[in-house]
């Protein structure tokens, strides 16, 4: 099963919820040429792990393991039986700490794979309700939409009929820590009402129109704090690249 990456075309922060989590308004688009892969493979006879992930990257505290534990509260017997014979193979291609939602996409694909393999018969809303307990971007990947306006803490998804130009990507070898970038954003005083008003305009425009008519700093509130924390990102800010998420992946329209 393929776990596709995503890009944020705009990302506006509009306040906090009761848990002090950031509220956002964003346009997510699915990147179908950048993906991880998940599959079930036969378990090696000497493996003693109840749930084993075989991967080309370090898997400790992986969000998939958290999803397994969450599912096991309701489907413990089914999961134990499956993973007594199978391991999960995860081939990681999406850059890590790059603003492309790789971990969230992997988690969504794992939930979908378990729903299908174990015939759990969970509908989309039930899967989204589970995902809210795990992470903010997962709901978009569960939806299967190619483009959507995303709000709340990432759990409110509205499909958008979009016009998406070809994007040219650059993946800097810079590991941007999401929490650190958000913390840096919080050091500044922002007019959240103004941000929300801008977001309501952006939500009505196609991706093509957004990238043609607005500057990178206008579209993504996290670009300036990202460049402050990671000085090597400043050149991309100055050269009119657009930032996905909290970085470090950047892109331009391929002319």
From Swiss-Prot:
Keywords: ATP-binding, Isoprene biosynthesis, Kinase, Nucleotide-binding, Transferase. One of its GO terms (molecular function) is ATP binding. Pfam families: GHMP_kinases_N. The active site is at residues 6, 137. The lineage of its organism: Bacteria, Pseudomonadati, Campylobacterota, Epsilonproteobacteria, Campylobacterales. Catalyzes the phosphorylation of the position 2 hydroxy group of 4-diphosphocytidyl-2C-methyl-D-erythritol. Pathway: Isoprenoid biosynthesis; isopentenyl diphosphate biosynthesis via DXP pathway; isopentenyl diphosphate from 1-deoxy-D-xylulose 5-phosphate: step 3/6. Its EC number is 2.7.1.148. GO terms for biological process: isopentenyl diphosphate biosynthetic process, methylerythritol 4-phosphate pathway; terpenoid biosynthetic process. The keyword Lipoprotein does not apply. It is an enzyme of class 2 (transferase). This is 4-diphosphocytidyl-2-C-methyl-D-erythritol kinase.
């Amino acid at each position: 099963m393929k776990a596709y990456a995503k890009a944020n075309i705009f990302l506006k922060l509009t306040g906090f919820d009761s848990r002090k989590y950031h509220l956002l308004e964003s346009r997510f688009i699915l990147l179908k040429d950048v993906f991880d892969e998940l599959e079930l493979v036969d378990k090696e006879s000497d493996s003693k792990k109840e749930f084993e992930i075989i991967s080309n990257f370090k898997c400790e505290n992986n969000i998939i393991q958290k999803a397994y534990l969450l599912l096991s509260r309701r489907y413990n017997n089914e999961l134990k039986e499956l993973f007594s014979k199978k391991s999960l193979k995860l081939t990681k291609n999406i850059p890590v700490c790059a603003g492309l939602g790789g971990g969230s996409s992997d988690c969504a694909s794992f939930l979908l794979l378990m729903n299908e393999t174990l015939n759990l018969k969970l509908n989309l809303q039930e899967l989204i309700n589970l995902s809210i307990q795990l992470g903010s971007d997962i709901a978009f990947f569960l939806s299967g939409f190619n483009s959507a306006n995303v709000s709340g803490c990432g759990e409110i998804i509205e499909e958008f009929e979009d016009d998406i130009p070809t994007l040219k990507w650059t993946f800097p070898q810079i590991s941007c820590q999401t929490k650190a970038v958000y913390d840096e954003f919080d050091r500044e005083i922002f007019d959240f009402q103004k941000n929300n008003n801008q977001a309501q305009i952006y939500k009505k425009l196609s991706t093509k129109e957004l990238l043609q008519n607005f500057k990178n700093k206008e579209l993504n509130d996290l670009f300036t704090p990202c460049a402050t924390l990671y000085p090597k990102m400043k050149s991309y800010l100055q050269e009119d690249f657009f930032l996905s998420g909290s970085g470090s992946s950047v892109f331009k329209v391929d002319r």
